[in-house]
C-alpha cells in the first residue's frame, strides 16, 4: 500500500514593528506588532496514519513537547482524526525571533486540517492560539498587524511591502524569550505599529520605513551586545531600515534592490556570522480555499506564492 506522505513548508516571520503596551493579569505582555512571512522555511514531511499516535523526528534537538508534536496531537485528540509521523528538516535558526518552532507547529496544523478537514476556522485558530502566540499568524502567513499576545490578526494587503526584501543576520548565541520578558520593565519604548499601519494604508513607504522598530531591542542588546553591533553595521550597509525580529537575536535590514541586499550579505558571510541570508516576503494562503494551495499528492503544496 502506498504511504500517504506529504511535504509542507514552515515559513519564518519577521516582526517589522513590535510594541509592548503593558503586562496583563495573566502574566503575558500585551503586544502590537506588524509581522511579515518570508521565504525562509523548515521542510516538513508528514505521513498520515490510521493509528491514534503522533511521532516527531528532526535533524536538530527537539524540546520536549515540541509545538509540532502538540499541534498534531491536539488536532487528533479534539477531532478523533488519525495520527501522523512527522520529520522536520530545520533551516530556520532557533532562538532567533523568527518563529521557528511556531512555524513548524503552524505547518503541521495546516497539513492536518488540509488532510482530515475536521475543524472549522474558529476552532482551528483557537487551537493555534493555545499552541503559541505566533502560531495563528503563521497558519496563513502574508502580512498582518497582530495584537494581544499576537493572536488577534488584521491582515494587511501587500502594497509597498511587496517590493521589499530582507537581509537576515543572526549572531551565534540566541536569546530566551522567557528570560527577556521576565526582565522587561516599564517604561516601554514608544509605540510605532499603529503609525506604521497607517503608513501602509497610505502607501507611504518613507513613513513606514521610519516606523520599523522593536521595543525589545534595548533589553535584548543588553543581554547580547552583538545585537547592537550587527544593527549598527546593518544601518551602514545601504539598507532602507534595520531592526531586530521578535525577541532576537536575529536582525534584519530592508532593501528594495535584491542585488544590494546580496552585496551587503557578502560582508557578513566573510565575517563568519552564524546565519545570514536574503529573503523575499510571501503572500498569505487560505487553508479553507482549495484553489489557494496547489496540492500535489506526495510533493506537497505551493504554499505562499513568493512575491
Name these PLM-found stretches.
Residues 1-96, 114-122, 158-161, 170-173:
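ATP-binding N-lobe of GHMP and related small-molecule kinases
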Residues 50-62, 108, 129, 204-213:
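Short, basic/glycine-rich phosphate-binding loops at helix/coil junctions
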Residues 54, 140, 146-241, 256-262, ...:
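Conserved, helical-rich catalytic subdomain that frames metal- and/or nucleotide-binding sites
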Residues 76-87, 111-131, 257-270:
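Phosphate-handling active-site elements
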Residues 96-122, 137-139:
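DPxDG-like acidic metal-binding loop motif
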Residues 100-101, 244-249:
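Glycine-rich beta-strand-to-loop/alpha-helix junction loops that act as flexible
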Residues 117-157:
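Glycine/threonine-rich beta-strand-loop-alpha-helix active-site module
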Residues 252-254:
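Short hydrophobic/aromatic beta-strand micro-patches
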Amino acid at each position: 500500500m502506498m504511504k500517504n506522505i506529504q511535504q509542507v513548508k514552515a515559513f519564518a516571520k519577521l516582526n517589522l514593528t513590535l510594541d509592548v503596551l503593558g503586562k496583563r493579569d495573566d502574566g503575558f505582555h500585551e503586544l502590537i506588532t506588524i509581522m511579515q512571512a518570508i521565504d525562509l522555511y523548515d521542510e516538513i514531511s508528514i505521513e498520515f496514519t490510521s493509528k491514534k499516535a503522533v511521532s516527531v523526528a528532526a535533524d536538530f534537538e527537539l524540546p520536549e513537547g515540541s509545538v509540532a508534536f502538540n499541534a498534531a496531537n491536539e488536532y487528533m485528540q479534539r477531532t478523533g482524526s488519525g495520527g501522523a509521523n512527522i520529520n522536520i528538516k530545520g533551516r530556520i535558526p532557533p532562538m532567533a525571533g523568527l518563529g521557528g518552532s511556531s512555524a513548524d507547529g503552524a505547518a503541521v496544523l495546516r497539513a492536518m486540517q488540509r488532510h482530515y478537514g475536521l475543524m472549522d476556522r474558529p476552532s482551528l485558530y483557537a487551537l493555534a492560539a493555545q499552541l503559541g502566540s505566533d502560531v495563528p499568524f503563521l497558519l496563513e502567513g502574508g502580512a498582518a498587524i497582530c495584537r494581544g499576545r499576537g493572536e488577534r490578526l488584521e491582515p494587511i494587503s501587500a502594497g509597498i511591502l511587496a517590493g521589499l526584501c530582507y537581509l537576515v543576520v543572526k549572531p551565534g548565541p540566541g536569546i530566551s524569550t522567557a528570560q527577556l520578558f521576565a526582565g522587561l520593565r516599564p517604561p516601554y519604548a514608544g509605540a510605532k505599529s499603529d503609525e506604521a499601519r497607517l503608513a501602509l494604508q497610505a502607501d507611504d513607504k518613507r513613513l513606514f520605513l521610519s516606523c520599523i522598530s522593536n521595543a525589545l531591542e534595548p533589553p535584548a542588546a543588553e543581554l547580547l551586545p552583538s545585537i547592537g553591533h550587527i544593527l549598527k553595521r546593518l544601518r551602514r550597509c545601504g539598507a532602507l531600515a534595520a531592526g531586530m525580529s521578535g525577541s532576537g537575536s536575529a536582525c534584519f535590514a530592508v532593501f528594495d534592490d535584491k542585488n544590494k541586499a546580496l552585496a551587503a550579505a557578502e560582508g557578513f558571510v566573510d565575517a563568519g556570522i552564524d546565519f545570514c541570508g536574503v529573503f523575499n516576503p510571501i503572500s498569505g494562503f487560505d487553508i479553507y480555499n482549495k484553489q489557494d494551495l496547489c496540492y500535489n499528492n506526495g510533493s506537497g503544496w505551493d504554499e505562499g506564492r513568493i512575491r
